Amino acid sequence: MFNDLISKFEIRDSILILIPHEVVDDELLILISHGSGGPGEAETAMSNFFLSHGYTVGIVDYFTKHNVKKLFWSDRPEYKDAYEATFNEMFDIAIPNYKKVVHIGFSLGGTLGLVNSTKFTKNYCFYPGTVGMTQELLDQDYSNTTVIIAQNDIWCSDYREFASQCKSPPRKWVAKDCYHGFMIPGKEKTIPIVKYVTTENVLSWGQFNTLGPNHEVLKSYFDYTWLTIKLLYNEKECIMYMNKILKECQSL
C-alpha cells in the first residue's frame, strides 16, 4: 500500500508511523484519524498525498485496542452499537514526540481532533460529529483548528450549534455541493442511521466521560431521530483541500 513511498515504518501504541524516502521536515508529523469505518480509503489517500510530498505520516487506529470493528450508529438489533469503551478512552491517544503535529481527522476522527485540539500544532477536522458538549469543550481555544463542513451534510449538522456556543470557535471552511464522506475515493452510497441530538444540553465532564459507541448509553442522554445519509466522493474538492492543508503545512 505504501511501500513505494516509504523508507521504513514504526508502530507506536496505536499509531502506524510511515517515513518517506526523503523527509522535508523531520520535526513535523502529519497525524491522521479515521471515522466510523476504521482506517480506510480516505486515510490512505491522505497518507499517500503527504508521503509523496516528503512528510512523515502517522495513521491512528483508535478502534482495535478497544475491540471496536466498525460503528453503525443504528438502533436495529443486528447493527446496534453496544461497545463498552467510552469515547474519551478511545480518543486518549499517545501523541508521538514531534515538535510540530498536524492532525487531520475524518468524521469521528474529526471529533477526536476537537476533543484533543490543544495537543496539536494545526488541527483539520473534516465533517466532524458532535458526541456531546461540556463547558470545558465550549471554553477550549480552537484557534489552531479548522473544521471542513460539507455543504449538504445533514449527519453532522449538530456541529454548527456546537460552534455557535464556543468561546473561540474553529475556523470554518465549507465544501460546496459536497456530502458527508466527500474525501473518500470512490464512495457513493446511502446509509440509514440514528442521529442523536447532542447539542440541546451541556453535560458535566463526568457525564461526558460515560459516553461511548453504545446505543443504550447514548439514548439515555439524547433524543434521536432516523435519517438516511448520502455519502459521495468529490474528487475536485478533495484535491483542493489536500492542497490547502499542504500549503499551510509548508509555512510551519
Residue ranges with predicted function:
Residues 10-19, 29-95:
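Serine-hydrolase catalytic machinery in alpha/beta-hydrolase-like enzymes
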Residues 21-29, 140-142:
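Proline/glycine-enriched tight loop/beta-turn segments at coil->beta junctions
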Residues 87-142:
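Primarily recognizes the serine-hydrolase "nucleophile elbow" in alpha/beta-hydrolase
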Residues 139-145, 168-169:
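Short, proline-enriched alpha-helix->beta-strand connector loops that line the catalytic pocket
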Residues 147-149:
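Short beta-strand/loop motif that positions the catalytic acidic residue
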Residues 154-161:
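Conserved alpha/beta-hydrolase "acid-adjacent" motif
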Residues 170-252:
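C-terminal catalytic histidine-bearing segment of alpha/beta-hydrolase fold enzymes
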